[in-house]
Amino acid sequence: MVFNMNLKEQAMSLFYESGFPKDFFSFLWITASILILVSGVVIGVLVIVWLERKISAGIQQRIGPEYAGPLGIIQALADGTKLLLKEDIIPSRGDALLFSIGPAIVVIPVLLSYLVIPFGHNIILADLNIGVFFWIAVSSIAPLGLFMAGYGSNNKYSFLGGLRAVAQAISYEIPLALCVLSISLLSNSLSTVDIVEIQSKFGFWGWNVWRQPIGFIAFLIASLAECERLPFDLPEAEEELVAGYQTEYSGIKFGLFYVASYLNLLVSSLFVTVLYLGGWNLSIPFLPNFPYLEWKFTAETSEVINVIIGIIITLAKAYSFLFISIVTRWTLPRVRMDQLLNLGWKFLLPIALGNLLLTASFQLIA
């Protein structure tokens, strides 16, 4: 993790003086970074689940969770613990191997997507030169896990849910990739850090949401479809397919699908923040942008304070998008399968392609 290089150098020198080998320090640093990221992601998912239950309760004029902890804040943790203790049942006539590895193939690509997300200045696990396309590439693996789960269940509802998941992913990943490519053309980079820094040069009005309004709307719709959220939750439509590819699952494997869904929703929200909303930069309209504030502390303390502020700003923007996603789920009806595919192939794909050509033309003229 790229984080406060002075702190890393001090820790490295301390380890060398203590007689530890260099490889041991690198292993310890990477392990600590991954554990911190995973812990933060898990806490973020628990917060999302609690927010969704409370917001949906408010929309439906209910109270929502209130007994497990203050305001029901640990209700999701209690539900997860209950799933851990439930029996793991494997269908007798299903494919046990596909049935077992399907949930893992769904969760792992989503976790890998967090590697290239900058949560703040110098807060990123892997600053790759192809960061955004790394996300597109690994996210395309998850539908394969859904199809394996549906096929391995030996259940017609599960199989149909897996087929729907693959069709939906293929339909909406292409417009999503075209929108990302338009942002990359504007920024002349595929690195997520470079994209944020390019936006920070021009303050609030330099955000890509103003420079790419058509692409932003297309990205918003495509990301909701990729997350399989209402009105695009066709692979697990309860009224049609019982529970889709999840029908035969129980216990922790059943819970992994829900974890992957909320992890994917958080990933999409963070990428909306990074690609369109200026990332960790706090930009106020009609005022100049100050990416780094000066504090009356030591240089290390000032850098840590700025890093914390950047993380808070990034999460605030991401959770604002999450609020829109949650409200959309509880206010719009589900579309039909043919409407879903028509929206992806006949509307979003031409719009995203036209937006890319328009962006490329302006870049050539400029």
From Swiss-Prot:
One of its GO terms (cellular component) is chloroplast thylakoid membrane. Keywords: Chloroplast, Membrane, NAD, NADP, Plastid, Plastoquinone, Quinone, Thylakoid, Translocase, Transmembrane, Transmembrane helix. It is an enzyme of class 7 (translocase). It comes from the Eukaryota. It catalyses: a plastoquinone + NADH + (n+1) H(+)(in) = a plastoquinol + NAD(+) + n H(+)(out); a plastoquinone + NADPH + (n+1) H(+)(in) = a plastoquinol + NADP(+) + n H(+)(out). It is a multi-pass membrane protein. Its EC number is 7.1.1.-. GO terms for biological process: aerobic respiration; photosynthesis, light reaction. One of its GO terms (molecular function) is NADH dehydrogenase activity. InterPro entries: NADH_UbQ_OxRdtase_su1/FPO, NADH_UbQ_OxRdtase_su1_CS. It is found in: Plastid, Chloroplast thylakoid membrane. The chain crosses the membrane at residues 29-49, 97-117, 130-150, 166-186, 202-222, 254-274, 307-327, 340-360. Its main location: plastid. NDH is composed of at least 16 different subunits, 5 of which are encoded in the nucleus. Belongs to the complex I subunit 1 family. NDH shuttles electrons from NAD(P)H:plastoquinone, via FMN and iron-sulfur (Fe-S) centers, to quinones in the photosynthetic chain and possibly in a chloroplast respiratory chain. The immediate electron acceptor for the enzyme in this species is believed to be plastoquinone. Couples the redox reaction to proton translocation, and thus conserves the redox energy in a proton gradient. This is NAD(P)H-quinone oxidoreductase subunit 1, chloroplastic.
